[in-house]
């Protein structure tokens, strides 16, 4: 599977400017809690899919979109199955909102911004 190496799995997440600010406020170490209308946190398995969301969804919705890349301990992700959201390249994990703190604890290193769209 793409993004896998040893004990960690590389994931991506497209974010808008508001979520990026909250990530920056964490020292680039954590994703913010989900809003009440967001019951699931969706990190994706490919940079290509994250770029598509950031460019095609985040930019029209909020004026800019960013792609973040980060590594998560494989042992944490083994508790979740990969979900297909549409096409075969649209793969993501569905992490319940109440488990975002545990997800953040499983992040290894910093969250990096790897692309920006306006």
Residue ranges and their predicted role:
Residues 1-29, 34-42, 48-118:
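Conserved NAD+-utilizing ADP-ribose enzyme module
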């Amino acid at each position: 599977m793409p993004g896998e190496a040893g004990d960690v799995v590389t994931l991506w997440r497209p974010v808008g400017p508001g979520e990026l600010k909250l990530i920056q406020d964490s020292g680039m170490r954590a994703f913010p809690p989900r809003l009440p209308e967001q019951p699931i946190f969706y990190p994706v398995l490919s940079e290509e899919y994250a770029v598509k969301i950031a460019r095609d969804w985040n930019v029209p919705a909020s004026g800019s979109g960013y792609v973040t890349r980060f590594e998560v301990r494989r042992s944490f992700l083994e508790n979740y199955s990969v979900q297909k959201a549409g096409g075969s390249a649209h793969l993501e994990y569905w992490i319940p909102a109440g488990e975002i703190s545990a997800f953040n604890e499983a992040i290894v290193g910093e969250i990096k911004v790897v692309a920006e769209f306006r």
